[in-house]
């Protein structure tokens, strides 16, 4: 009977690559939040903009910022896990 050797599902390098991808995604989400807030500011001076547009865009910007923070937290956890060699 042949048994496979125990192996780690992800190498340390793979974890660090994933952590970097998460960090990069967090930066993108921060940029999207910035753009959404800029749009909110622009619409504030536009009388033709529907009333619902600014609050909706503000909520989306906040969601992007929250997601960015969560991705950063996940990236840091992966980095710590890789550094610990677990």
For the regions a language model picked out, list residue spans one by one.
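N-terminal secretion-targeting helices of virulence/extracellular proteins
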Residues: 1-86
């Amino acid at each position: 009977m042949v048994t496979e050797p125990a192996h780690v599902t992800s190498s340390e390098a793979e974890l660090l690559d994933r952590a970097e991808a998460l960090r990069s995604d967090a930066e993108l989400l921060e940029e999207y939040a910035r753009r959404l807030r800029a749009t909110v500011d622009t619409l504030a001076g536009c009388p033709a903009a529907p009333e619902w547009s600014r609050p909706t865009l503000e909520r989306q910007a906040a969601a992007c910022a929250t997601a960015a923070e969560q991705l950063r937290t996940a990236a840091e956890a992966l980095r710590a896990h890789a550094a610990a060699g677990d």
